[in-house]
Amino acid sequence: EDVARLAEFITRIRPLADAVVAMYHRLPAGQGRKLLDQALEQGLHTLDDPPEELTALFHQVDHEPIWLDRAQLRLACEVSHRVGLAGELVLRNLSLMGGYLAAAAAKPLAFTGELDRMANRRLVETGKFWIDVTTPGGLERDRDGFKSAVRVRLMHAQVRAMLLKSDKWDPAWGHPLNQWDSMATILEFSVIFLSGLRSLGFLFSKREREAVVHLWRYVGYLMGVDERLLPACEADAMRALYQVIATIGESDEDSRRLGEALARASLQDSGDGWLAKRLGKVEYTLRAGYTRYVL
């Protein structure tokens, strides 16, 4: 049953976002993105005659699922920010680095090239996204977290469309940025994040852990992850994590190159002075040591 479930979701994408990207190409250059931005910033109702693709997308994201509990979202934000800089260490050197172990899931990033430059860019973009969605109230309809989740969803759809047109994409890797990989990404920010913090000595109550899983369940919903894949509780999330680990496959040369580029980012950001370079090497050693410890 689990194998059949995996086979279904590695070839399944996020059709509502993909339809919006197709709309971009159908309309005059820039018009589709302008319509999306207006619907996101001011509401779909402000468009005189919205394309059906946008209507379908916003019908989904503007609908709050029956299971959504905003009190849990508030608690999850408090938990996420009370850990301070340790949260950044775990997200960068466990969650992101661990994601590169899955060769097929790492392929979309490897296709971009210029891995050193892209590693720094990904750190900045991921950091902003995390701050947006974990800021108290950030997932309210008119706040940055909600908008960031939807925009990342559309960005993934654009990358997916580009890769599927490339003759270098191997169908054996599944669909790029597919549903299974997207669910695994949600786990990186929830139970893997919590596990990494616990490895550093942080303690969380069951209520706090459930709240973090709940927040990322809603983020996944906004990003178009199939609700059947979204963990409803910590136990579901851990079960899904075991399934991901069991089916992750072997890492490859692209995985290694991505990991090295991410590790080198601290050296590149350290500055030009002697002391700055020395401190950069200390940071590199600290981060590499933590990655070896947890992975």
Residue ranges and their predicted role:
Residues 1-186, 190-295:
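Mature, function-bearing regions of proteins
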